[in-house]
Amino acid sequence: MNYNNTLAPICLFVYARLNETRITVESLQKNSLSADSQLFIFSDGSKNVNDRKRVEAVREYIHQIKGFANIEIYESDVNKGLADSLISGITKIITEYRKVIVLEDDLVLSTNFLDYMNEALTFYEDKKRIFSISGFSFSLKYPKDYKYDVALSLRASSWGWGTWLDRWEPIDWELKSYSSFKWDLLKHIRFNLGGSDLSRMLHRQVKGKIDSWAIRFTYYQYVNNYLDVFPTKSKVINNGFTSESTHTKYKSDRFDTTLDISEQRTFSFLEDIKKEKYITKQFYKHYSFIGRLKDKFSKTSWKINK
């Protein structure tokens, strides 16, 4: 094997969506760093008899994938669900390689996605307040003299992201600190600076109404006062709002973004690790109750249970 050990390994989580999986992989293959990168594919087992053939079709496809330095496939005999599949899969790979890039089977990636992710993971590795690197971003307004290719937020994105072992390993997946959070209004207000939907999703997770790795990931980020890095030009768009989606069924205009189609391969990163009020305000507005209410009554409303 002649793969490049300085590049972060890529974990791809798939289930039963052949077309979406193919689109994700093909966009990843168009990245110049793909040939030097390791790809680890985790295929979850079918939930029921109806899904079995679709799972098998995806598995037949992933065994034909080429274009990477090394490909390893892990097929589960049982249905773990996305949360357990992702947590266990990432833990397996990140424990060995100490950093990871994570994809699900519903994304379209820019051709410079791997350049951006690897450069950001290297640049911010020793800046311990940075919790994760996001590849997705929605359209934000920046000062005219803004010269960086990234910004910082209180909320991570689950659509193409990366992190490091020392941030991942201590995460409280069991939400042991929730009891001290539940009735503390000030903590709710602070958590919801990343979006007024966060506390509600966390409560639903604790009650067992959703099974989400992402809300637990974001809650741990809040508890530790971490920040997320995201690009000023999105390196990812989501292609997963279909009837076959496990967690997202309806597309939302709030998540429309423009994919970076430039040939840029080196990026300018922020040295000063602090949150900016104008970014926080835009995130809060984007994920606000009013914004979600507009979606609910629009033709493009969506439902998330991730």
Write out the residue ranges for each language-model feature:
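An acidic/histidine-cluster motif and surrounding catalytic segment
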Residues: 1-102, 107-306
